[in-house]
């Protein structure tokens, strides 16, 4: 009979129903090592669904806003940012560009723009005092020359949409904040920008989740983005101004912590529809910029916690090497056996995750497939940053220790007549 014949053949082949029931169980068990690479999806979902946005903020006007732009050798970008600020729908405002002793045409361009619009003023920078880093010093000079009830510190390599300032002031008031900072859209144009920048920005986004920043009860959980910091003058003065962070490499992070210690409220929002910036334009600039900031900024993110500060190098290794485990395991196993299956699954999950990140950053999604290269490069930058930062950072004639405090001037070789090239991330 057909039924019995069928039954016999199944039994004879050794594929009993009991044996078949074990196959998927074994497969699922073998894939369990890949589960850690599902966790980032949960973090990404949380980040996407708890992201305060300037789009929700009301439009505001009224108080004079002093927009302060520290600039050193920014001739290629200064006109763009100035014109974008002047196109703001917010009224009233004044715009002060602090020329930090530029050797290019920055001052000339600003003078031309000032002749076109009376709201623009050029503030010639004074010599850098001992114990000060460039950007805090430029910001303080801009503050001293300003008249506004509100102060906006923004970078020269940013571009503002017309509603950015009005919505930012609206959010500052609606949230009752003493410091408003935003995350702009990060423009990634070249190959290395698109491969490496997502790795670093994800680490920052997970470390400083906006929901955590906005309800922070601990100093370690607050941050500010130096590309855009809006503060009432009264709150800024009460927190000690940028003078309180004059010797800090990560002056924006240190300023947020200073505000928190002073009992001030910080609000962080996404502004990807209203502001954009491009930090680096080459692999060399990217490596140099993050090498200076990554380790020292990581240590600064755990103020008064020496044990966690000491663990920063390990945190950087774990943060980037996490993504290298699946592809390395896949290469070693050739995809064979249980470990190979788990490695293949983990690699696939990681690739999907980074493709989603690329889409979120408006990068072609296929760059997500290159995540092992990005993670490896970021890991190398982290190692380089640790090596340099743990010893001494030399930048524009001064030395900085791991605490970020100036260790004094460096002797300059007589043959050196030019300053190092301007780094997009670095203070001017």
Where are these regions (language model features)?
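N-terminal membrane-anchoring/stem segments of glycan-assembly enzymes
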Residues: 17-61, 197-198, 206-210, 378
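Membrane-embedded multi-pass helical conduit in multi-pass membrane proteins
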Residues: 24-27, 59, 308, 312-390
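Long helical/loop segments within the catalytic core of UDP-sugar-dependent glycosyltransferases
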Residues: 37-40, 48, 121-144, 167-239, ...
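Short, well-formed alpha-helical segments that are part of the catalytic scaffolds
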Residues: 47-55, 74-87
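Cell-envelope/extracellular polymer assembly enzymes that use nucleotide-activated donors
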Residues: 63-66, 94, 254
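Acidic donor-binding segment of Leloir-type glycosyltransferases
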Residues: 82-129
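Acidic donor-binding/catalytic loop of UDP-sugar-dependent glycosyltransferases
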Residues: 105, 154-171
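Catalytic donor/gating beta->alpha subdomain of glycosyltransferases that bind UDP-sugars
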Residues: 172, 179-205, 234-237, 242-306, ...
């Amino acid at each position: 009979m057909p039924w019995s014949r069928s039954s016999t053949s199944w039994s004879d082949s050794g594929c009993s129903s009991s044996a078949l029931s074990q196959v998927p169980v074994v497969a699922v068990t073998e894939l369990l090592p890949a589960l850690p690479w599902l966790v980032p999806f949960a973090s990404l979902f949380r980040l996407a669904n708890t992201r305060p946005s300037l789009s929700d903020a009301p439009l505001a006007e009224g108080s004079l806003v002093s927009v302060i732009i520290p600039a050193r050798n920014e001739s290629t970008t200064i006109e763009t940012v100035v014109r974008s600020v002047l196109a703001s729908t917010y009224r009233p405002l004044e715009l002060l560009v602090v020329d930090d002793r530029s050797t290019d045409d920055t001052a000339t361009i600003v003078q031309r723009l000032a002749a076109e619009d009376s709201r623009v003023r050029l503030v010639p920078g004074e010599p850098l005092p001992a114990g000060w880093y460039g950007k805090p010093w430029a910001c303080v000079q801009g503050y001293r020359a300003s008249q506004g009830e509100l102060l906006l510190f923004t970078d020269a390599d940013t571009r503002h949409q017309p509603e950015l300032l009005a919505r930012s002031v609206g959010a500052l008031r609606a949230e009752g904040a003493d410091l408003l900072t935003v995350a702009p859209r990060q423009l990634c144009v070249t190959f290395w920008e698109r491969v490496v920048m997502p790795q670093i920005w994800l680490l920052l986004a997970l470390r400083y989740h906006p929901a955590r920043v906005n309800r922070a009860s601990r100093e370690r959980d607050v941050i500010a983005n130096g590309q855009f910091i809006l503060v009432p003058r009264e709150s800024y003065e009460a927190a000690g101004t940028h003078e309180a962070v004059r010797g800090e490499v990560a002056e924006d992070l240190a300023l947020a912590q200073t505000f928190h210690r002073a009992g001030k409220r910080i609000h962080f929002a996404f502004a990807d529809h209203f502001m954009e910036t491009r930090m680096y334009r080459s692999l060399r600039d990217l490596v140099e910029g993050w090498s200076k900031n990554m380790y020292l900024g990581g240590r600064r993110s755990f103020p008064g916690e020496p044990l966690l500060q000491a663990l920063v190098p390990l945190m950087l290794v774990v943060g980037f090497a996490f993504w290298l485990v699946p592809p390395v395991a896949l290469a070693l196993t050739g995809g064979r056996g249980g470990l190979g299956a788990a490695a293949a699954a983990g690699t696939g999950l990681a690739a999907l995750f980074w493709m989603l990140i690329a889409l979120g950053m408006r990068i072609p999604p296929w760059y997500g497939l290159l995540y092992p290269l990005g993670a490896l490069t970021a890991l190398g930058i982290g190692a380089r940053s640790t090596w340099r930062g743990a010893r001494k950072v030399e930048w524009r004639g001064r030395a900085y220790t791991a605490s970020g405090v100036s260790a004094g001037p460096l002797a300059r070789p007589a043959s050196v007549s030019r300053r190092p090239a301007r780094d997009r991330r670095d203070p001017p």
